[in-house]
Structure formats: C-alpha cells, structure tokens
From Swiss-Prot:
The keyword Ribonucleoprotein applies. Part of the 50S ribosomal subunit. Homodimer, it forms part of the ribosomal stalk which helps the ribosome interact with GTP-bound translation factors. Forms a heptameric uL10/P0(P1)2(P1)2(P1)2 complex, where uL10/P0 forms an elongated spine to which the P1 dimers bind in a sequential fashion. It comes from the Archaea. The keyword Oxidoreductase does not apply. It comes from Haloferax volcanii (strain ATCC 29605 / DSM 3757 / JCM 8879 / NBRC 14742 / NCIMB 2012 / VKM B-1768 / DS2). Belongs to the eukaryotic ribosomal protein P1/P2 family. GO terms for cellular component: ribonucleoprotein complex; ribosome. This is Large ribosomal subunit protein P1.
Length: 113
C-alpha cells in the first residue's frame, strides 16, 4: 500500500511518477524498498491518469447500508427451514419424561422468537 501512497504523493506534488522518485519517497519514509514492486507499480501506472482515477473513485456511489441481495435473503430462509426441521427432530427424540424446559434449553425459544 505504501508504494501506491508514494505514487499519490508524487502526483500531488507534480513530480514524475517513475522508479527513481518512488524509491526516493519510500526510502525517506523508512520503507524497505523492493525494486520489483517499484517496477511493477510504474508499469501499471504508465497509462493511468491518476487525477481522473481519484475523481472517479471519489464520485462512485457508496453502497446502501443495511441492504442485502435477494439471493442472500433466500439462503437465510432456507437455513430457517432447516433449523425448524432439526428442532422438530430433536423434540421427538429428547423425551426423557422431564418437563423442565430450562434443562432442555427449550425455554430459550421464547427469547429468540
């Protein structure tokens, strides 16, 4: 991440984003510089307009909070059905003659609906 930040600093200060300048920024920040990562970053940013990329990223709409995709809701419904089937199976085989709901954990159903 610090490599990208170095490129952003260079862009903001109107310096050329090249291997030498990125290495200088990283060394000034005390980062152990890997030349292969510097070369890869410079190659990746060669045809990129950084200002345009920043504006595009800043203008992108934020995802709606609390919303979920329809597929996720359906999967949750399937899980609820499976849980209900498991509970029904558990109720039939757990009849030890003890009507103490607390001991069986059945009293918790009222708390969680």
């Amino acid at each position: 991440m610090e490599y990208v930040y170095a490129a952003l600093i260079l862009n903001e200060s109107d310096e050329e984003v090249n291997e030498e300048n990125i290495t200088a920024v990283l060394e000034a920040a005390g980062v152990d510089v890997e030349e292969s990562r510097v070369k890869a970053l410079v190659a990746a940013l060669e045809d990129v307009d950084i200002e345009e990329a920043i504006e595009t990223a800043a203008a992108a709409p934020a995802p709606a909070a609390g919303g979920s995709a329809g597929g996720e809701v359906e999967a949750a419904d399937d899980d609820d059905e499976e849980d209900a089937e498991e509970e029904a199976a558990d109720e039939g085989g757990d009849d030890d003659g003890d009507d103490d709901e607390e001991a069986d954990g059945e009293g918790l159903g009222a708390l969680f609906g």
